[in-house]
Amino acid sequence: MPEPAKSAPAPKKGSKKALTKAQKKDGKKRKRSRKESYSVYVYKVLKQVHPDTGISSKAMGIMNSFVNDIFERIAGEASRLAHYNKRSTITSREIQTAVRLLLPGELAKHAVSEGTKAVTKYTSSK
């Protein structure tokens, strides 16, 4: 009858291999790379609109992808508009036109009015 396969002995608690993975040579822990996302801002808006509602991490991931996608579309369209008009700067006018082109009907109107309100608030606070 064959003998059962023996597993490798478990590494000791203070082994050198475990130490090098978690810590650098000078004894400091490695800094985790920061992953940028819009989750803080999505959460703030959610609490403004529905204070008693939460959001799952999966839903937050979807919202983050959505915001990134819309941002890229608006930036791309605004860039094309600036290029067509032989301009090297994207201004609020290009952004506004890009939003009007990308978003349908009533949604575009609301987005433009909220954007105008935000720009006015920003310029008045300077």
From Swiss-Prot:
Question: Where is the Glycyl lysine isopeptide (Lys-Gly) (interchain with G-Cter in ubiquitin) crosslink found in the sequence?
Answer: 35, 121
Return one GO MF term: DNA binding
Please list the residues that carry the modification N6-(beta-hydroxybutyryl)lysine: 6, 12, 21, 35, 109, 117
Record PTM N6-butyryllysine, positions in chain: 6, 21
Give me the gene this protein comes from: H2bc9
The UniProt keyword set, sorted, is:
Acetylation, ADP-ribosylation, Chromosome, DNA-binding, Glycoprotein, Hydroxylation, Isopeptide bond, Methylation, Nucleosome core, Nucleus, Phosphoprotein, Ubl conjugation
Q: Which residues carry this modification: N6-methyllysine?
A: 47, 109
Residues that the record marks as modified (ADP-ribosyl glutamic acid) are 3
Residues where Dimethylated arginine is found: 80
- What is the official name of this protein in its record? Histone H2B type 1-H
Which residues does this entry mark as bearing N6-crotonyllysine?
6, 12-13, 16-17, 21, 24, 35
- Which positions does the record annotate as the modified residue Phosphothreonine? 116
Gene3D superfamilies according to UniProt: Histone, subunit A (1.10.20.10)
| Location of ADP-ribosylserine modifications | 7
What positions are modified (N-acetylproline)?
2
The N6,N6,N6-trimethyllysine modification is found at 86
Listed under GO cellular component are: nucleoplasm; nucleosome
**Modified positions (N6-(2-hydroxyisobutyryl)lysine) in chain numbering:** 6, 13, 21, 24-25, 35, 44, 47, 58, 86, 109, 117, 121
Lineage, highest ranks first = Eukaryota, Metazoa, Chordata, Craniata, Vertebrata
N6,N6-dimethyllysine, modified sites: 58
User: What family name appears in the similarity comment?
Assistant: Belongs to the histone H2B family.
